[in-house]
């Protein structure tokens, strides 16, 4: 009996401690910034609320007043930042605010098993090895596959129109195009998502993403250590997908020695592995992250671009169509003022990853003049909040206004660079760790949108509920568009 009472007491104390750790931030967290209630992160799972609405209702006021808040996510309390000067400090002082990805933050999770240790999440000498291996392939690439895939996408849309399908869900199609783009441009093989309607590789990836990005397990990743059948299957599927992906790269680049004559990012990774700069797991991790990040962010941007062109079809869709008509060389698209101002505004309005928490303090430090952060605390940034901050963007911060970037291409480029340097736009992050794929992603957007504009007019499906994603990547939720073709003048 006494033993039973003792066990009950231990269980009660344990549960009380866990509840306290979830409800209340650690006592050594800064007291001079607000705490966002722990339950806020769960609201999109319970109610039909998207992440921009969540930000406006529960985070915006505190974030805009203080520039930083305490925020519960991923089984822990974090410091979440949006003020530009704080972000500039974080990006500049990487030795204090060190990159710390899922492989360190939640190494026991299915998500960490999926992406591993890679060029996005690594730190120090290891990161430099990764960066040296992949930079050339991501910065200097052949854009011909992107042009070809944009035409294939348009053909698929036309086929659906011929079948009488006037309202078309764009998420699956844009994902298929983005997968083929990154695989052909950076990995040296054709994923085949556009040309094969039932692509086993693609279906495997979709299944994994549903398992890994389940909102509940993202919020409580420690549950992945429990013998839950669905999580055990998630780990098994992750291992299988990684093996299939690397085998495909081996078949296309290694076994035939093609990597020796090519400059794909994957080719450079293989050379780094052969020269013993990186090991086999690091090779696999970086091939996986190139595919994952290299298709997700362009897919999200493309969907947001299509959405905004549909929403403002009478103005911006018509303006851009007139500008791109007659442009036959894809490289000329980079010099079009309206197209580029539009794209930069899309990135500002809807950064593909609205919230990123992947920095960890290596020592007790001060953020700004007054916010003292203990050692070992995860610090993240709310990209949506930064690019919608009225202190930076004025009273039109929430308005879609591509003209804010300028009227000529030189001014537009200058303002884009300045906004990134001032950390006013962090969709591609900043500092030394700025996204290596920015050039590739924007090239994909220019070519794909130009081809769409030449071949179609489109509008929002009246039956589609105008809503953004509830959590995670930011874009229109299950976007549906109505198309008409034969619009070239």
Curated annotation (Swiss-Prot):
Heme binds at residue 435. The keyword NADP does not apply. Keywords: Heme, Iron, Metal-binding, Monooxygenase, Oxidoreductase, Sporulation. PROSITE patterns: CYTOCHROME_P450. GO terms for biological process: ascospore wall assembly. Involved in spore wall maturation. Thought to catalyze the oxidation of tyrosine residues in the formation of LL-dityrosine a precursor of the spore wall. This is Cytochrome P450-DIT2. It comes from Saccharomyces cerevisiae (strain ATCC 204508 / S288c) (Baker's yeast). The gene is DIT2.
